[in-house]
Regions:
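N-terminal export leaders
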Residues: 4-8
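Extracytoplasmic/periplasmic ligand-binding sensor regions of membrane-associated signaling proteins
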Residues: 113-183, 258-262
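Extracellular/periplasmic juxtamembrane segments that couple receptor/chemosensory ectodomains to their
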Residues: 234-289
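Conserved beta-strands of PAS-like sensory domains
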Residues: 80, 158-202, 269-271, 278-289
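Juxtamembrane extracytoplasmic/periplasmic/luminal helical "stalk" adjacent to the first N-terminal
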Residues: 24-77, 95, 160-165, 177, ...
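Bacterial N-terminal signal peptides
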Residues: 11-19
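Solvent-exposed, extracytoplasmic
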Residues: 80-95, 173, 180-229
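Extracellular/periplasmic ligand-sensing ectodomains of membrane signal-transduction proteins
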Residues: 89-140, 154-155, 224-243
């Protein structure tokens, strides 16, 4: 699980401003290739981490149902302990990169989350994500939604988007659900996991390769016209991805180009990512020095 922590600058984050150019020679091609390759690495990481959540939530519900207090509204500390047990006793959720695990009543009121401070408590998740109400229907299984809620933001400023996964928790008695088990992540906070994962894979490659240079890489989620990267990534990266319409262009074919930024060349690549719907893609802004 991703723990909230101070948003410290990464050693390879460089501030810059962008201007799109038609071509920048060999360095442009090399940076494009690096970005294109890094997209595949990012997609591998995302596929692994999404599977952990989707596989783990139904199993976690079984643990949560057993540990739930009879009066969750009046026993919120006990409920928090049950939520923690659901994650810790489910193999996939133990290592999931979620930024929250929470429980909500059938009408959407979040009673407790696993970690403190609990920014989501007493928020109505169904008002922010009405589509999650489908999870309360018989045999609905997992239901997912995307949107914005201040309590789920992973950054103090700038755009963010949340991925929320819900699964009904059966009541110990009766047919109606006791509530919803919730998880998911802030795309901005998860982008940090994706970025660090891609960089680590590139470092590992240098151990068995003659090429020891590691490109600068900034992975992004692209969805619904927005671009969501590591909180410390330069804002201009996301602005450029939106300006280039990289997300929409990647839906029909893999997208790649390069731009010059303060006399340095950066490659951009994007590929669609159906794990998050038809309007989603993974992009990387990269530079080979």
């Amino acid at each position: 699980m991703i723990r909230r922590r101070p948003l410290l600058a990464l050693p390879f984050a460089l501030p810059f401003a962008s201007v799109a150019l038609p071509g920048c020679g060999d360095q442009g091609k090399a940076s494009e290739d690096a970005a294109f390759d890094a997209v595949d690495l990012a997609k591998e990481i995302v596929a692994r981490d999404v599977e952990q959540v989707r596989k783990g939530m139904p199993e976690g519900v079984k643990v949560l149902q057993k540990r739930m207090p009879s009066d969750p509204l009046g026993s919120r500390l006990e409920l928090q302990t049950a939520i923690k047990a659901a994650r810790e006793n489910t193999d996939s959720l133990q290592i999931a990169k979620s930024t929250f695990f929470s429980f909500a009543t059938p009408d959407g009121l979040v009673l407790r989350s696993e970690i403190d401070p609990d920014r989501l408590v007493d928020q109505n998740i169904l008002k922010a994500f009405p589509g999650l109400a489908k999870a309360l229907e018989p045999n609905a299984g997992l239901v997912e939604a995307y949107g914005q809620l201040e309590a789920l933001r992973g950054v103090r400023k700038g755009d963010d988007l949340a991925w929320v996964v819900a699964h009904a928790v059966p009541a110990k008695e009766g047919d109606k659900p006791a509530g919803l088990f919730l998880s998911g992540w802030s795309f901005r906070l998860y982008a940090r996991v994706m970025q660090e994962g891609v960089r680590q894979k590139l470092i590992e490659r240098t151990k068995t390769s003659e090429k020891k240079e590691i490109p600068v890489v900034y992975p992004y989620f692209l969805k619904s016209g927005g671009a969501y990267g590591d909180p410390d990534a330069p804002d201009v990266n996301a602005e450029q991805l939106v300006k280039l319409e990289a997300g929409s262009k990647a839906q029909s074919a893999d997208f790649r180009t390069h731009i010059e930024i303060e006399k340095r060349t950066f490659g951009i690549a994007a590929k669609k990512e159906p794990l998050f719907g038809d309007d989603s893609a993974i992009a990387v802004v990269a530079s080979v020095f």
